[in-house]
Amino acid sequence: MANSPQSKKRARQAEARAAVNKARRSRIRTFLRKVEEAIATGDASVAAAALKTAQPELARGVTKGVLHKNTVARKMSRLAHRVKVLSQPAAA
């Protein structure tokens, strides 16, 4: 347990930051889930729109230090590829 005033303050700050980061991660996961659901339905236009709204949220997660930049780059790339495949006509 924190004993000095400084360590008590640091513990309070860490707790507050953890709560903010948890909310940010939850928000990002919600946007990702919307993209996944749109892809699952097979509607390319809805999936593209969902991806377009999710990309800035993912980028913001990197800026705020919630997610690693390579993790976000990988997620964006994979989702964009899946949306692209969905929007292409089926090869006969």
Swiss-Prot record:
**Annotated segments matching region Disordered:** 1-22
Q: Does the keyword DNA damage apply?
A: no
Q: Which keywords are on file for this protein?
A: Ribonucleoprotein, Ribosomal protein, RNA-binding, rRNA-binding
Q: Does the keyword Iron apply?
A: no
Q: Which domain of life is it from?
A: Bacteria
GO CC annotation = small ribosomal subunit
Which Gene Ontology terms cover its molecular function?
small ribosomal subunit rRNA binding; structural constituent of ribosome
InterPro entries assigned to the protein according to its UniProt record, in alphabetical order: Ribosomal_bS20, Ribosomal_bS20_sf
List the GO biological process terms: translation
- Tell me its family: Belongs to the bacterial ribosomal protein bS20 family.
Q: What does this protein do?
A: Binds directly to 16S ribosomal RNA.
What is this protein identified as? Small ribosomal subunit protein bS20
